[in-house]
């Protein structure tokens, strides 16, 4: 497959050949969804915690005698039915991670890339280099490319000036190619790849 290459100024810079095995698949939403769930589960902190009846700070003595009061039988005021008592079956500190095979994760990334290509939301630029780290200049670059919401993927090493210039622009994320992931691809409108990123992806999946 051939796709036009743009410069950061928005002019044409030839074409690039894209691998069908990476950008030409028929996107499977089920595989992509599994990958997104896996990523979000890994991100979740899991620091939620409530105190059980064994952990609340309250006396453990029996509230009143067992018989003769006409009231319901109770032991400690730590029981879950009382205000200030422990929580029954509450959340505990735990990891929310679950397993997803490495081959499925790799396949999900290829399907996400293919989905962007199929939706005409993939842009290839020749290089991501800025003369200086000025946000105003970077805003002009993204306007020239028609980008308001995008994930920008560079090569293994990002140009420092370009990275700093784009850092404060809302809805624009810049990552090196080794940081590319399904969740970030889907949460942004356009996907911008440098030629170096395309080469690195094809090397990774060959």
Curated annotation (Swiss-Prot):
Q: Which Pfam families match?
A: Ribosomal_L4 (PF00573)
- Got a GO cellular component term for this one? ribonucleoprotein complex
Top-level division of the source organism's lineage: Bacteria
- Which GO annotations describe the biological process of this protein? translation
Annotated region (Disordered) at 63-96
Example of a GO MF term = rRNA binding
In this chain, composition skew of type Basic residues spans: 64-77
Q: Which UniProt keywords apply?
A: Ribonucleoprotein, Ribosomal protein, RNA-binding, rRNA-binding
Assembly, in brief, is: Part of the 50S ribosomal subunit.
Q: Which family does it belong to?
A: Belongs to the universal ribosomal protein uL4 family.
Q: What does this protein do?
A: One of the primary rRNA binding proteins, this protein initially binds near the 5'-end of the 23S rRNA. It is important during the early stages of 50S assembly. It makes multiple contacts with different domains of the 23S rRNA in the assembled 50S subunit and ribosome. Forms part of the polypeptide exit tunnel.
**Protein's name according to its UniProt entry:** Large ribosomal subunit protein uL4
């Amino acid at each position: 497959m051939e796709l036009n290459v743009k410069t950061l100024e928005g002019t044409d810079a030839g074409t690039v050949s894209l691998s069908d095995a990476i950008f030409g698949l028929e996107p499977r939403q089920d595989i992509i969804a599994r990958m997104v769930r896996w990523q979000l589960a890994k991100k979740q902190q899991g620091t939620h915690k409530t105190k059980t009846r064994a952990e609340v700070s309250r006396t453990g003595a029996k509230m009143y005698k067992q018989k003769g009061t006409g009231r319901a039988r109770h032991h400690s005021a730590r029981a879950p039915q009382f205000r200030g008592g422990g929580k029954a079956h509450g959340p505990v500190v735990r990891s929310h991670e679950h397993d997803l095979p490495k081959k499925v994760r790799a396949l999900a990334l290829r399907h996400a890339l293919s989905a962007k290509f199929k939706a005409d939301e993939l842009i290839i630029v020749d290089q991501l280099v800025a003369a200086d780290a000025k946000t105003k200049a970077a805003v002009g670059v993204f306007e020239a490319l028609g980008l308001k919401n995008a994930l920008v993927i560079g090569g293994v090493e990002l140009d420092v000036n370009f990275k700093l210039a784009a850092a404060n622009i809302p809805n624009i994320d810049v990552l090196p190619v080794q940081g590319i992931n399904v969740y970030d691809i889907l949460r942004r409108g356009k996907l911008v790849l440098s030629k170096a990123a395309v080469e690195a992806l094809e090397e990774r999946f060959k």
